[in-house]
Amino acid sequence: MALWIAVLLGVVQGIFMFLPVSSTAHMVLLEHWLIGRDHPMPAPESAEMILFNLVVHVGTLVSIVVVFAPSLLRFTRYSLRDAYGWARAGRFQGPPLYARLFLLGMLSVLFTGVVGLTLKATFEQVFANPWMIAFTLILTGALLFWTDKLPPRRRGLRQTGVGTATLIGVAQGFALMPGLSRSAMTIVFGLFAGLKRRWAAEYSFFLAIPTICAATLLQAIEVYQLGGLESVSVAALITGFVVAAGVGIVSLKLVIYFLYRAQLKVFSFYVWALAAAILLGWIDLPI
């Protein structure tokens, strides 16, 4: 893979991983576009390309850790405090908010995995169908537009329960389909469940950490089984990782800015325009 392609793919992953417009759809569309014009890059289903996509996803994981470092440190500290109190005295010392949130997050990831593994074959068919990608982009835009019409939400993380965690986990599972944005689905359904915008965002992006880690593990196993990594460009992997992480920090801060101001409909117009371009054949894809 040429370094300029690694930079381009890293930029796209970094921008669209957090903007609620589906990073997977953009990566798929860009990869098809590059291949259709005979640019030097591996096939999307090759072990090398799967590994590259895995690495840039880990890069965006670094973005989350950097942006939410204070909150993550607080969460880790108090979760360990809750766990220590339970191990030492057989009970929690005070309300176990952080331990409870940890368990709810794991529940969300569990339901994401159930949906993802159950519908994996269906989602893979969408990857090869630009018309289906266009449809899911239209749906993403509709959800974003509707979200800005919601009245102010009142629930905080203390009021988050099993039902909310399950709903968000299922929504994230369906977001594995190209065109359905992970951040959009989790934030929208968090708001639908009554969470305040700030907490819907924080839960969404905190949830991305174990989700990306689990997906990385599964993809690493797949890459190992495929083999054929002798031609992998380490320079391209490092470049994609660094670019995705750096661009992801800016992208994440941008989406938080718009979310807190109830302006997600800005992104709905973009995904509708992209869907229209696909349907009208303005984006020529070799499918």
UniProtKB/Swiss-Prot annotation:
It is an enzyme of class 3 (hydrolase). It comes from the Bacteria. GO terms for biological process: cell wall organization; peptidoglycan biosynthetic process; regulation of cell shape; response to antibiotic. It catalyses: di-trans,octa-cis-undecaprenyl diphosphate + H2O = di-trans,octa-cis-undecaprenyl phosphate + phosphate + H(+). The chain crosses the membrane at residues 1-21, 49-69, 101-121, 126-146, 160-180, 203-223, 232-252, 267-287. GO terms for cellular component: plasma membrane. One of its GO terms (molecular function) is undecaprenyl-diphosphatase activity. It is found in: Cell inner membrane. The keyword Iron does not apply. Pfam families: BacA. It is a multi-pass membrane protein. Its EC number is 3.6.1.27. Keywords: Antibiotic resistance, Cell inner membrane, Cell membrane, Cell shape, Cell wall biogenesis/degradation, Hydrolase, Membrane, Peptidoglycan synthesis, Transmembrane, Transmembrane helix. Bacitracin is thought to be involved in the inhibition of peptidoglycan synthesis by sequestering undecaprenyl diphosphate, thereby reducing the pool of lipid carrier available. Catalyzes the dephosphorylation of undecaprenyl diphosphate (UPP). Confers resistance to bacitracin. Belongs to the UppP family. This is Undecaprenyl-diphosphatase.
